[in-house]
Amino acid sequence: MAKDIRVLLYYLYTPIENAEQFAADHLAFCKSIGLKGRILVADEGINGTVSGDYETTQKYMDYVHSLPGMEELWFKIDEESEQAFKKMFVRYKKEIVHLGLEDNDFDNDINPLETTGAYLSPKEFKEALLDKDTVVLDTRNDYEYDLGHFRGAIRPDIRNFRELPQWVRDNKEKFMDKRVVVYCTGGVRCEKFSGWMVREGYKDVGQLHGGIATYGKDPEVQGELWDGKMYVFDERIAVDVNHVNPTIVGKDWFDGTPCERYVNCGNPFCNRRILTSEENEDKYLRGCSHECRVHPRNRYVSKNELTQAEVIERLAAIGESLDQAATV
């Protein structure tokens, strides 16, 4: 299948005047050329992933590079056979990635233009991975790590990025006196988080410049020492990184077998991302727990128009029943 679609991943920390109006104007331009994607705009900068054919994406890159302060913005490009998005969104937010340091007066925000960790090239990052005295910290969410991660990297027990600072404070004895290198998908999270670690007193903090996306495309390292796939926030869900000796590390939520297929739990009030096969999705009604399987608003049940009798039958097949139900 021809790969005539390009997916652009990018970000830039740069002051944007009248960012709300900038976002509105940006959306109008994107729609005018038929671009699809999701872009966040804040006073501190811009962060986005967009997709379109060659002509459309080239128009977009030329447009962005024509904007004051964005002449050198770095686009990371994937070639794909299908669009990565169905619609176009440009939204104004407080931050281009929500670390939330100022939430509940936890801490002051970080400006990566003033404080950030040392940039590591893919080659330098690979060397860090092989150094037993270096701590490698994954700054992404738990479900991203579970699909794929760098070999030996620490998996913080967090559901979202804004929980990471507290997790680090709670576990600082593990790596306070060591060299720490961090990584994320494209680099935007690490710019801010590595700066926060520097401010916390960590003496030697590095970050993978350009993120996992750049590491996988580097002609020298070719994604080596990455296990599994990289989670992405678009229709693709998962993309390849390791082009030397790829492996599968994801495990099916229900039976632990190798799996790289993500779905959201059928209970809309849970919405946990779970790895599972189509067979197990059907078998367990896409519910990550019994409570989610029998929830009255289970989306799998409604989408497939299952009758109560059919639900009872499937529950019985896995040793469960409706009268075990509890409210979530």
Swiss-Prot record:
It is an enzyme of class 1 (oxidoreductase). GO terms for biological process: tRNA modification. InterPro entries: Rhodanese-like_dom, Rhodanese-like_dom_sf, Rhodanese_C, TrhO, TRHO_N. Its EC number is 1.14.-.-. The keyword Repeat does not apply. GO terms for molecular function: oxidoreductase activity, acting on paired donors, with incorporation or reduction of molecular oxygen. SUPFAM superfamilies: Rhodanese/Cell cycle control phosphatase (SSF52821). The keyword Metal-binding does not apply. Residues 130-224 form the Rhodanese domain. The active site is at C184 (cysteine persulfide intermediate). Keywords: Oxidoreductase, tRNA processing. It catalyses: uridine(34) in tRNA + AH2 + O2 = 5-hydroxyuridine(34) in tRNA + A + H2O. Belongs to the TrhO family. Catalyzes oxygen-dependent 5-hydroxyuridine (ho5U) modification at position 34 in tRNAs. This is tRNA uridine(34) hydroxylase.
